[in-house]
């Protein structure tokens, strides 16, 4: 009997693992999985000045192979994915993990925070380039499959991208179920095409020997260094393996990489290389030239589907990253909509969606060809990869307590490779690499302005703050008129009197029969268990102090907090008998120490245009009382 139960449990576990692997293949590997469309073609770009030869083909294929082995398989899949923050991955999760042992006021804390935020900002540059280059390179297959449609490549690309962003509002949970199967077909097609071409010139397999990569670098020196920036295109999307770890877990992602994705990609790259050895004229577009003529149009359709899926993963990542940044205090509150009742991670951020739409379409129209976009691609990703290595080194030493010598050896080994790719990509700045850097830098500046501005607002508020408990004691000694119902005061600091309470007492001169103060605290972990979320302290006379803790991947829910606190608070808070009091701060730039005047004005503008607290906390407008207050910074 027990053996039967064990067998059943094992079988169910295997089924779940397979389902998770398929799901991961559909979401995690979209970006890196569509790189064969343009990576090898860009490596042989005439602008690099590398004369076509058998040695060049073997050298470049060897570099592609070892780049994937070292950066993706060793660094990300086997090493970085160990640095999970309660199961969550991504650069902000890694930053939060690295800060656990840092002094809150130390320079180390500030430096690690800035590094993590800057790395996250670079993702926004990637989020603009990825959809543009992926869909455009897929549609360029029409130039080979149906030359008469060549003039329509750009318009079709724009239409596909516009449609992709327009459907975000309704959510993608329904079509999302097709992502895994479609990407499985895509990787199967990559593997099959690669295998067919590989059999025509199996001698390409000698490129697994790193001697060919070293010889290529030695022979061509500076030109080979330039090519290294194009070789990096096979690695774009590697960061997603770590970033999406919280959705699928490390094991399904590792299985998906080693047993499906990596073999398919390597077969395709080696197949493209074999085809170049047999027919050098195919260098203009090795991917589509490797496809039999009768299958070229179906392959364009499949490639379009795969690139849309890759783009969707990046767009969803931008929504998720924005939500995390809001919780960590780096971004003003924005309206966030949940597009699925089953999946809490499926969210829609309107402001981010429309900004990405405008930028992506603008990039496609400005660069026009995937070759031109390839020059802009990579530098943002390499920046994030370098920062990931640095933060991982901090985690190794301060959290895992590894031996300093081992930390140095491991981190330096990865850092040498990262810096080689980063340096090679710096050469692309003039040809378009400036765009993602400029975009990421602008986002970083805005985020740091908001973060610094919020610190100043908190500091000014604390200067004039009144300790809550002595104030309540004095208030209850000479109580104002008590009225029926419940008043909920949202406050940033549970130890001080909310400005909204002071204004309510000043103007209305009443106190509700039940008063609840709620303060939200964001922890350095992604999720907080409901059992540990709410702490309630009864002050007496119907007054309660509630502290609600949330992870940086969660969005505060006032109603849920009231439900969790009900056993201590008493009777249920009925919506129609509850008023929510919120202080609406009006920021006034001044000559007080803090930021320069123009940055203070920028912060004031961001503050004014952020989502109202009632919208962010999803409180019905007719139950909210907003009381204004001015804060000089």
From Swiss-Prot:
Gene Ontology molecular function terms on file: potassium ion transmembrane transporter activity; symporter activity
Coiled-coil positions: none
Keyword annotations: Cell inner membrane, Cell membrane, Ion transport, Membrane, Potassium, Potassium transport, Symport, Transmembrane, Transmembrane helix, Transport
Domain of life (superkingdom): Bacteria
Family, per entry: Belongs to the HAK/KUP transporter (TC 2.A.72) family.
Transmembrane segments: 20-40, 52-72, 109-129, 147-167, 178-198, 221-241, 257-277, 299-319, 347-367, 376-396, 404-424, 431-451
Source organism per UniProt: Ralstonia nicotianae (strain ATCC BAA-1114 / GMI1000) (Ralstonia solanacearum)
A cellular-component GO term for this protein: plasma membrane
Name of this chain's protein: Probable potassium transport system protein Kup 2
Transport as UniProt keyword: yes
Subcellular location per the Swiss-Prot or TrEMBL entry: Cell inner membrane
InterPro entries recorded: K+_transporter, K_trans_C, K_trans_N, Kup
Taxonomic lineage from the root: Bacteria, Pseudomonadati, Pseudomonadota, Betaproteobacteria, Burkholderiales
Membrane topology designation: Multi-pass membrane protein
Pfam families registered for this protein in UniProt: K_trans, K_trans_C
Catalyzed chemical reaction(s): K(+)(in) + H(+)(in) = K(+)(out) + H(+)(out)
Protein function: Transport of potassium into the cell. Likely operates as a K(+):H(+) symporter.
């Amino acid at each position: 009997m027990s053996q039967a139960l064990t067998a059943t449990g094992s079988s169910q576990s295997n089924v779940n693992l397979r389902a998770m692997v398929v799901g991961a293949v559909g979401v995690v590997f979209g970006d890196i999985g569509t790189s064969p469309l343009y990576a090898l073609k860009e490596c042989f770009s005439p602008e690099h000045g590398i004369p076509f030869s058998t040695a060049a083909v073997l050298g470049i294929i060897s570099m592609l192979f070892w780049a994937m082995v070292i950066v993706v398989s060793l660094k990300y899949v086997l090493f970085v994915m160990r640095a999970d923050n309660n199961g969550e991955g991504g650069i902000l999760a890694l930053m939060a993990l690295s800060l656990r042992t840092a002094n809150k006021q130390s320079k180390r804390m500030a430096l690690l925070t800035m590094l993590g935020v800057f790395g996250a900002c670079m993702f926004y540059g990637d989020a603009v380039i990825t959809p543009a280059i992926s869909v455009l390179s897929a549609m360029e297959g029409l130039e080979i499959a149906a030359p008469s449609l060549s003039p329509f490549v750009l318009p079709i690309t724009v239409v596909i991208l516009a449609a992709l962003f327009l459907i975000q509002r309704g959510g993608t949970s329904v079509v999302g179920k097709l992502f895994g199967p479609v990407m499985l077909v895509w990787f199967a097609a990559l593997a099959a095409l690669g295998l067919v071409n590989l059999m025509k010139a199996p001698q390409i397999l000698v490129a697994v020997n790193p001697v060919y990569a070293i010889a290529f670098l030695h022979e061509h020196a500076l030109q080979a260094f330039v090519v290294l920036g194009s070789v990096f295109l096979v690695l774009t999307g590697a960061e997603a393996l770590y970033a999406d770890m919280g959705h699928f877990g490390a094991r399904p992602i590792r299985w998906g990489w080693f047993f499906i994705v990596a073999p398919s990609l390597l077969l395709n790259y080696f197949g493209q290389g074999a085809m170049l050895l047999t027919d050098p004229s195919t260098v203009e577009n090795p991917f589509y030239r490797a496809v039999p003529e009768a299958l070229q149009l179906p392959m364009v359709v499949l490639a379009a589907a795969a690139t849309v899926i890759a783009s969707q993963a990046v767009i969803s990542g931008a929504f998720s990253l924005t939500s995390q940044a809001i919780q960590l205090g780096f971004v003003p509150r924005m309206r966030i909509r949940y597009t699925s009742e089953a999946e809490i991670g499926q969210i829609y951020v309107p402001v981010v969606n429309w900004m990405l739409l405008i930028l992506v379409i603008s990039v496609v129209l400005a660069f026009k060809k995937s070759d031109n976009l390839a020059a802009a691609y990579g530098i943002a990703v390499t920046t994030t990869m370098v920062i990931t290595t640095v933060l991982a080194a901090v985690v190794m030493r301060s959290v895992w307590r590894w031996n300093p010598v081992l930390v140095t050896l491991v981190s330096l080994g990865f850092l040498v490779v990262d810096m080689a790719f980063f340096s090679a990509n710096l050469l692309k700045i003039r040809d378009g690499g400036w765009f993602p850097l400029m975009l990421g830098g602008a986002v970083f500046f805005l985020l740091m302005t908001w973060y610094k501005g919020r610190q100043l607002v908190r500091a000014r508020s604390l200067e004039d703050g009144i300790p809550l408990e002595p104030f309540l004691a004095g208030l209850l000694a000479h109580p104002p008129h008590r009225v029926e119902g419940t008043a909920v005061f949202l406050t940033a600091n549970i130890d001080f009197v909310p400005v909204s309470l002071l204004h309510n007492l000043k103007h209305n001169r009443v106190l509700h029969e039940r008063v609840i103060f709620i303060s939200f605290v964001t922890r350095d972990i992604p999720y907080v268990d409901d059992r540990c979320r709410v702490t309630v302290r009864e002050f007496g006379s119907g007054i309660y102090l509630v502290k609600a803790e949330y992870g940086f991947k969660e969005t505060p829910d006032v109603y849920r907090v009231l439900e969790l606190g009900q056993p201590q608070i008493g009777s249920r808070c009925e919506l129609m008998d509850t008023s929510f009091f919120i202080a609406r701060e009006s920021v006034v730039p001044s000559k007080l120490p803090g930021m320069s005047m123009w940055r203070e004005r920028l912060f004031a503008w961001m503050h004014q245009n952020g989502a109202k607290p009632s919208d962010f906390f999803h409180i019905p407008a007719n139950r909210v009382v907003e009381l204004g207050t001015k804060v000089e910074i």
